[in-house]
Each structure stands twice: as C-alpha cells, then as structure tokens.
Amino acid sequence: MENSLPKYITLTEDNIDKEHICCAFSDKKCLEGYESKKEWLKKEFANGYVFRRLDARAKVFIEYVPAEYAWLPVTAPNYLMINCFWVSGQYKGQGHGYNLLQFVIEDAKKQQKNGLVTVVGTKKNHFMSDTKWLLQHGFKEIEKLPNGFSLLVMRSCLNFIQK
C-alpha cells in the first residue's frame, strides 16, 4: 500500500542551494531578493533557524527560530518564534497548516521551550500568517499594537488544538 501522507523537507546548509524557498519562485523580478534570503538563511541555520516546507513546487512552508535569535523586535526568552507560515491556493484545507505547526510544536517540546510566539496582522494581510487560523489552533493574543500588528502566544504546546 502506498503512503499517501504528504512529504515535508527541512532546508539545511547542505540542500538549500538546490531547493526552492517558496517565496516568489515564479517571479524573475524577485531573483536578487530570493538569492539574498537564501544566503541569509545559510547564516541563520547556526542559530537554530528552521525552514520546513512541502516537498513540492508550492508555497506551503513554515519558518521559525529560537526567539532569542529572531529578527523581529520581540522579547520572548525560551520560546520559538514563528517568522513566516504560509499555505497558499490549492493547498489550503488539506491539513498542511496543521502538519507544519505540529512540527514546530514537536521541536518546542524536544527543546523544552515554554511555547511559541508570532507576530500577525490585526487585519488580514497577504504577507502575514493567518491570525484567525492561529487563534483557532491554540494561540492567544497577548498584545495588540495601534499600527495593525498583534503578538500571539501559545504558552504551552499542550494547548494545541488537535484536528
């Protein structure tokens, strides 16, 4: 019997040159930024940065790092910071968001982290993680800024809402 579970891969220094990073892979105007991000990721892997994606030519991925090394101005010691989390188009509704978030939760447990944090928009933005979905899956809003951003936290990975 064939295994029908989707395959996900984690990018590393060893495979990043031959793998895509989801962001604008079809837009030639973004090539310079795309290559710059790959170079940045190579350096950040040493800080525990993780880029996990669907093993397909799709925008289905999650990026996270120990919050102490996050590029966002958030103080959250002993948490994992989700920097980017995206499931687009035809891949929505197939469990990929759940699966990717589960990978982060398992990493947080292995690393004995206090939980997860992320910055989201107070309104839906195409460039931000889906606030509503994260709230439905165990995150709580702990700070709302007047400039349209909120800080979400999952204090204990035991709070994850199972499907």
Where are the regions that the model predicts?
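Short amphipathic alpha-helix that is part of the acyltransferase structural core
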Residues: M1-D55
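Conserved beta-strand in the GNAT
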Residues: R53, R57-Y69, M81, W86
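A conserved beta-turn-beta hairpin within the catalytic core of GNAT-like acetyltransferases
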Residues: A70-I82, K92
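Conserved acetyl-CoA-binding loop-helix of GNAT-fold acetyltransferases
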Residues: V87, G93-A108
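Conserved GNAT acetyl-CoA-binding A-motif
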Residues: A108-K123
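Conserved catalytic-core motifs of GNAT/GCN5-like acyltransferases
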Residues: V119-V120, L135-V153
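Conserved active-site tyrosine of GNAT-family acetyltransferases
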Residues: D130, L134
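Surface-exposed beta-loop interaction hotspot
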Residues: L151-K163
